[in-house]
Every structure is written in structure tokens, then in C-alpha cells.
Amino acid sequence: MSAVAPEGRPLLRLEARNAQTPIERKPPWIRTRMRTGPEYSDVKGLVRAAGLHTVCEEAGCPNIYECWEDREATFLIGGDVCTRRCDFCQIDSGRPTPLDRDEPRRVAESVRTMGLRYATVTGVARDDLADGGSWLYGETVRQIHALSAGTGVEVLIPDFGGRADQLDEVFGAAPEVLAHNLETVPRIFKRIRPAFRYERSLDVLRQARAAGLVTKSNLILGLGETAEEIHAAMRDLHAAGCELLTVTQYLRPTPRHHPVERWVRPEEFLDWERVGAELGFSGVMSGPLVRSSYRAGRLYQQAITARGEGHTAASDLPKSVLETSHTQ
């Protein structure tokens, strides 16, 4: 696989340097088996019939069979070009298209058509917009709730530069879960996420928790971090009020992206899940093929249970989603 720059810009020096390392061969445990059931088949049929688009299919997520069987899906908003560049992310950076103000309605209609019990909404950073795209995130949550009152909504947001007014726009839409991903540890943070700041990301989670929202984040392993640094980042997240955590293996999208520093074995991921529980997270999912939206409805219910609350929004979630245990 050759290193080709996104259309409209030259290859960055960092990308050229990354490309000197060939794409790594995946270990045998980085694979998944196709397991389909009636719910998955029904959702797939609805998606095909209505011509809908989900991140699950378009990103080739290995967990699509499990998530769709639970009637969970993820949607990308704001376009497919980001104003920032993270060295692990497959979404290209550049000049985004104009804001599509009808997108929230279309996403909400897709959620209703698919009969989803839980929807995750993520998107690109839109630093080109005066409000950072905060209205788009908030309005998408509002539209989904309006059309599908029984559907839980998780929104995975950028940091909006830490601006309280932009964060409040999203918080005020009352998503069931407010997710903001820390992704990596302080020592390599600037290299991996140059447009973000470690402490600012923690502060987003603090503000979300102060607003009463269920909070969630993600850590990616295999970028060059040490075990001590992972543990410290987990402690920082918990201290910031983060309730739910996913821990994932870095999979390199293209030669332009950061090389995989190591493949983390499944048993180490189980160790990190135990560490997270000991630190006091309400729910942790940790595994080579776990992604931040994996079994999101189940994790949400673990947070609700830990808070001692009754189930609030997605009242028709099935027993499989309400279980606080899970299998990898």
C-alpha cells in the first residue's frame, strides 16, 4: 500500500516519515467471526431499502454484527473532512464542505427507520465554523429524541476549544452519554493529537459531569505508551469524573499514519479492564477489537446502575442490553 495524500494537499512531512514503515502484519487475535442473527438481518435490510449510511458499514467496523444485533449503530456528522489531523485517525484533514443544516433531521429519520434502541453520533472537528459545530451536535441529539423518544443517544464530541458556550450547546441537548476521547498519554499526546490538549480534554469531561451527564472516554493502546502511563491516564480520567471507559488496540489506517508500536495481547486488555474496575469506573470494555462505540448501550446501563437510577431514556432496551455483564 503506497502513501497517497488526500486530494487537494501535499503529503505532510510527518506522513512521509510514517510511510517509511510498512503496514504491519496483524496478529492472529485481530480478527472477528461473522455472527448474524434476526435483528442484524432486519437492520441490514432496512439500511439497504432506505439507502442509509452508517459509520458501522462505511468504516468496515468488525463489531457491526454484534451492535446491529442489539440495534445499535453509529453515525458520522459534519462531513467527511476534519479541520484537525490526529495521527491515528482515518478521517482526512482539509477544507470541509459547507454546513448541512438538514443533516440532523436526516440522521434522526435514519435512526427511526432502523428502529434503533441506541444511537451513537460522532463527527469531525469543525473549527471553520463560528460555533465549532456545536449546534450541529446538539440539534442532532434533539432531533433523534424528538422522533424516537425511546432511543438512547450517545454523542462523541471534539473539545470545541474548551469553550463553555459551545459545550453548553451540546450539554443542553441532554444526550444519554457525553463522550470525549482522551485517546493517549501526556508524553506523546502532542505528537499524536497536535490540535488537542490533554488537560483540556480532561476538562471537557469535568464540565460534562458537572452538568449531570453520563461521561465516557477512550484510550488507544499501541501508539508508544508505557503501562505506567496507561495507568496514570486512567487515574486522570476517573479523577475528572469519567464514568465509562473503552480501551482499544490501535489499527493503522494507511501508511501515512503512525506506525503500530506494539500489538497488545488479549490478556493484557483483560488486565486493564480489571484495573478500571478497581479505580472505580462504572463500566469498562477493553479488548483488541473494542471501539469507543462498541456495545455502547450496555455500558450506558452500567453507569445508570452505578448511579442508582432507574433506566431513563432508552426504556425499551432489551434484556441483552440491560445486562451489566458482557462477553468479549
From Swiss-Prot:
Catalyzed reactions = [[Fe-S] cluster scaffold protein carrying a second [4Fe-4S](2+) cluster] + N(6)-octanoyl-L-lysyl-[protein] + 2 oxidized [2Fe-2S]-[ferredoxin] + 2 S-adenosyl-L-methionine + 4 H(+) = [[Fe-S] cluster scaffold protein] + N(6)-[(R)-dihydrolipoyl]-L-lysyl-[protein] + 4 Fe(3+) + 2 hydrogen sulfide + 2 5'-deoxyadenosine + 2 L-methionine + 2 reduced [2Fe-2S]-[ferredoxin]
Q: Key word Transport present in the record?
A: no
The enzyme's main class, written as a single word, is transferase
Q: What is its EC number?
A: 2.8.1.8
Free-text cofactor note: Binds 2 [4Fe-4S] clusters per subunit. One cluster is coordinated with 3 cysteines and an exchangeable S-adenosyl-L-methionine.
Identify the residues that bind [4Fe-4S] cluster 2.
82, 86, 89
> Known InterPro entries for this protein?
Aldolase_TIM, Elp3/MiaA/NifB-like_rSAM, LIAS_N, Lipoyl_synth, rSAM
**Which parts of the sequence bind [4Fe-4S] cluster 1?**
56, 61, 67, 293
Q: Which UniProt keywords apply?
A: 4Fe-4S, Cytoplasm, Iron, Iron-sulfur, Metal-binding, S-adenosyl-L-methionine, Transferase
**What pathway is this protein said to act in by its record?**
Protein modification; protein lipoylation via endogenous pathway; protein N(6)-(lipoyl)lysine from octanoyl-[acyl-carrier-protein]: step 2/2
List each copy of the Radical SAM core domain by range: 68-282
Q: Which GO terms describe its cellular component?
A: cytoplasm
Question: Which GO molecular function, any one, fits this protein according to its record?
Answer: metal ion binding
Give yes or no: UniProt keyword Metal-binding: yes
Tell me where it resides: Cytoplasm
Please give the cofactor(s) recorded in the UniProt entry for this protein. Answer: [4Fe-4S] cluster
Principal location: cytoplasm
What SMART domains does this protein map onto?
Elp3
Q: Quote the SUPFAM superfamilies the UniProt record gives.
A: Radical SAM enzymes
Query: Pfam families in the record, alphabetically?
Result: LIAS_N, Radical_SAM
Name the family: Belongs to the radical SAM superfamily. Lipoyl synthase family.
What protein am I looking at? Lipoyl synthase
Q: Which organism is it from?
A: Frankia alni (strain DSM 45986 / CECT 9034 / ACN14a)
Gene this chain is encoded by: lipA
